[in-house]
Amino acid sequence: MCIRDRLYAQAVDTALRTTGLETFEALREAGSAKLAQLPPDHGAEYGKAPLARRLQDIARLVRSGVGLQLAVTEMGGWDTHVGEGAERGQLAQRLGDLGQALAAFRTDLGERWGDVRVVVMTEFGRTARENGNRGTDHGTASVMLVLGGGVRGGRVVGGYRGLARSALFEERDLAIGTDVRSVLWESAAAQLGVEDPSPVFPGFRPTPAVLG
């Protein structure tokens, strides 16, 4: 199965799927069959996790120089209502897969990593405390990861109020400290030169730099 098919076979949104297929149709002229067989570079080892395979496909596109500007992928399995685990279990496995995939992606790109920015985010958080099934339920705030060229890494950015019940939103969830749009907008402005956020985030007013 070619890169195009792998990335869009499970796309739910019709507009996204159609646009993606049209974009990758152009890659046929660039030899996408050969591109799909391009091995990892710099000794990168992706492993077998689904996210790793998707990031490997994206790395192939970046390395091919076809002009890729934006790519979106996803990783499931985080809805751990039951048996979430701590240092071992579902959560630890997902975090391990995520870390390995990102590390391989960075290694594979080599010098091209300086031209790439990766944003990792979730659509909702988890409760701050365990439920009765040794898992966590849907919450409010969560964490984002930003890495790549132009990012001053090794830092935790944003406010953290702790886990005391009085510090939690509705006494159960982490409170939102940073608007997710601020991080996405800052990244889009830095990487793509976007000057007006309104087409993507109507009504949003950019805040001072979050990432610095």
Please report, for each region that a protein language model flagged, where it lies by residue.
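Sequence context surrounding c-type heme c attachment/ligation sites in exported
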Residues: 1
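Histidine-centered active-site microenvironments of extracellular/periplasmic hydrolases
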Residues: 124-155
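Feature for exported/extracytoplasmic and membrane-associated proteins, marking the mature portion
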Residues: 4-108, 143-146, 155-212
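Short gly/pro-enriched beta-turn/loop segments at secondary-structure junctions
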Residues: 65-68, 113-114, 139
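Metal-dependent active-site segment of extracytoplasmic phospho-/sulfohydrolases and closely related
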Residues: 102, 106-133
